[in-house]
Amino acid sequence: MRKKKNKIRVAVSGFSGLDNPEPGNAVARALRYDLGNNIDIEGLTYDVWSSGAWPSGLIDRLHLMPPLSSGDHATLNRILEINAKRPIDAIIPCLDLEVETYSRLSRQLERNGIKTLLPNQEDLDYIKKISLPYFCYKNDILTPNTIHVPDITNVAFYADQIGYPLMVKGTVADSKKVHSRENAIYEASRLNAKWGGGVLLQPFIEGDEYVVAVVCRHDNSILGMTPVRKLGINERG
């Protein structure tokens, strides 16, 4: 039986020091601001040099996690090891690559008293980068014409059809703006080698870019939303 505690204890990941793409620092600050000393925050990191975790008074402890590539079992074992010493009430995974892992582990975590609030695998499959354009079309959301090219030997053909400049995107993460067929082939080969599954091609569209962070309830209604306009764009978009 879990011992009753006065404080709640939440594990938070994503502490590279940059809010995008690792917003753990911002999440921890929000929790600390709202709950003060009534919360213990356990930081989860894949790198001991994660600078976002070190500001004084932000988190209570920092734990090194095994790489996600080690598999679900390694992640679960490490969480349960931490949980055995200091029982965790909830986990907030702040990296997009972690969401699927913790979604798959949610039932096992629940059995050990650890709560999550994550989409199920079916919903995650629905909005993967390969499937996202179809989701947008179905829900009348404007989106660039997107071509998934599973065989990168066909990249040159489809890139020429779209025209230049265009965006070459990995199936999981990462992207590159290219200005020629040669650049498209090179970047497609690089991204496919890194992420697998081919690449996505999109026309490059000028304009302001935004990141929107949303917290939803179980019924998908929005609890809170914060849009951020990107003030600077690097070569990866």
Regions found by a protein language model. Give the residues of each.
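Active-site nucleotide/adenylate-binding loops and adjacent lid/helix of ATP-dependent enzymes
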Residues: 123-208, 216-222
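Hinge/lid segment of periplasmic solute-binding proteins
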Residues: 117-123
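Oxyanion-binding "anion nests"
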Residues: 224-226, 235-237
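Catalytic cores of alpha/beta
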Residues: 212
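A short acidic/small-residue loop/turn micro-motif
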Residues: 230-231
